[in-house]
Amino acid sequence: MATYAIGDVQGCYPELQRLLEKLRFDPAQDRLWFCGDLVNRGGQSLDTLRLIHGLRESAIVTLGNHDLSLLAIALRKQDAQARVNPELREVLFADDAPVLFEWLRSQKLLHHDEALGWTMVHAGLAPIWTLRQAQRCAQEIERELSSPRYTRLLKNLFGNRPAAWSSRLQGIERMRASINTLTRMRFCDVNGRIDFEGKGAPGTQKPGMYPWFEVPGIRRREMRVVCGHWSALGRFAGLGVYGIDTGCVWGGKLTALRLDVEEPQYITVDAEPHRKRLAGEGD
């Protein structure tokens, strides 16, 4: 049985199909971990969601910021939903949208496999978090999203404050800080305060900011973390962190990382020729 983590798909359905073919993926034996941002910008978000939803127990998903945004948009009135981009509109008005949204709300913010020794998140971990703290923060959000109270969280999801997670935070502010960390973080300062504007490669950040995994004094965790979200970082391996957002939606590659082997193995497919490589990166 093989276990692969897959970077940000963002609706790049043809590339996902080609990648699964290249992996010779067998749903009866193999497992796929998706780092999040399943939807938006690639053109075929609905097909992507249907494919991954159909994998059932063969797929594990950690939600990304685009996935959470889609869930929040789904709570708007229909006239507001009709004003979003055509790709997301197709998802919102699909006959099976309620099933797909309920499934998305049941997914994770963090996944840890003790036997494999791997942890997966979409973006990153707060410098002060232990693994157990990170799991607790993720589980708080997961419980809320899968409960009848999910609308309260999704309606208060967005905002850059608090910019840093703290054990003193409570309620919605605590969950928003955790979500910002798990799904939006790239650069932060020594106190874990996130720079929400910095989206370039390491070395382009503002003074006093660091890639989240290079913060001085960071709690070094005896684990390996696989994450996406940061296409300007690209394929990265260092300090126990493996970045696999290789910018497929921008004309780069879609990347899988095999996890169940002593030396992690990268497998990639090129983006479809029509995808345009853009300078910089979106959220």
Predicted features, each with a name:
Residues D8, D37, G64-N65, L104, ...:
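Divalent metal-coordination and catalytic microenvironments
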